[in-house]
A protein has these predicted regions:
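C-terminal transmembrane-helix exit sites in multi-pass transporters
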Residues: 31, 48-70, 189-208
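Transmembrane alpha-helical segments that form core, pore/gating elements
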Residues: 88-146
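Helix-helix packing/entry segments at the starts of transmembrane helices
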Residues: 42-47, 114-130, 165-196
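Juxtamembrane helix-loop boundary signature in multi-pass membrane transporters
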Residues: 50-98, 102, 113-116, 215-231
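C-terminal-most transmembrane helix of multi-pass membrane proteins
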Residues: 186-231
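Loop-to-transmembrane-helix transition segments
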Residues: 2-28, 92-100, 145-163
Length: 231
């Protein structure tokens, strides 16, 4: 019976709770995508790093430094300049997206807690499993048989999404949430570059200004954190 004492107890309930919360966040996100402009969806989505940082400060007692808060605010301003969302009417789609950001923030906070005892592989695998179970009933309600092109695209999305989550989980295990969250805004710059190179989308002054603010915020944060580590 000695071997049983050496078997690590897996926090299934915590993994399951996170998977359900994350799955419901995805459902709300897809609902908002079909009901409001994509710029508004993306803009509201960038409240997630802010909610996550607030949660990290309250729950994990992470240090509140000027550099971290400044980077978060500056990145958010940069994102708004790029997206130029319109918020004239508070519609159901916008409310759904707001709740989605809150649920995603809770999911990341649970993931941060799990990194204390669980491996990156375990966290990603259990999220995929429980989120899939959560999403399955919603998928069956509107199911249509995908063609081969759709299957390949879905496979690509699944692979890239899993890799993204894998590396994000590694980041959560290595650094405080208040440091990792501002970096999320950097994905907007990559999206803009992809749109420019692959889809011939145009640049304007607001995109350049917003991108510059995000880069300045992240570079400044990284430089200051490196200086703090050397002291």
């Amino acid at each position: 019976m000695q071997y049983k004492k050496n078997i690590k107890k897996i926090p299934i309930l915590k993994h399951g709770l996170r998977g359900i919360i994350h799955g419901l966040a995805v459902v709300l996100w897809f609902y908002s995508v079909t009901n409001i402009p994509m710029a508004d969806v993306t803009a509201i989505n960038y409240l997630t790093p802010i909610f996550t940082t607030i949660g990290a400060i309250l729950i994990f007692k992470e240090a509140i430094t000027f550099n971290r808060i400044f980077a978060l605010i500056l990145s958010f301003i940069g994102a708004m300049l790029i997206l130029k969302p319109g918020f004239e009417v508070l519609s159901n789609g916008k409310i759904a997206q707001l709740f989605s950001t809150i649920l995603f923030a809770i999911s990341y906070l649970i993931a941060k807690n799990l990194t204390k005892t669980e491996s990156t592989h375990s966290i990603v695998i259990f999220l995929t499993f429980f989120a899939t179970i959560t999403l399955l009933p919603f998928a069956l309600l509107i199911w249509t048989n995908p063609i081969m092109t759709d299957l390949l695209l879905l496979l690509g999305v699944a692979i890239l999404g899993t890799l993204g989550h894998y590396f994000m989980t590694i980041a959560l295990s290595l650094a405080p949430l208040s440091i990792t969250q501002p970096v999320i805004f950097f994905q907007l710059i990559w999206s803009t570059l992809i749109g420019l190179l692959l889809f011939e989308e145009s640049l304007d002054l607001f995109i350049l200004m917003g991108g510059a603010l995000i880069v300045i915020a992240i570079v400044r944060l990284s430089a200051n954190e490196n200086l703090s580590l050397k002291k």
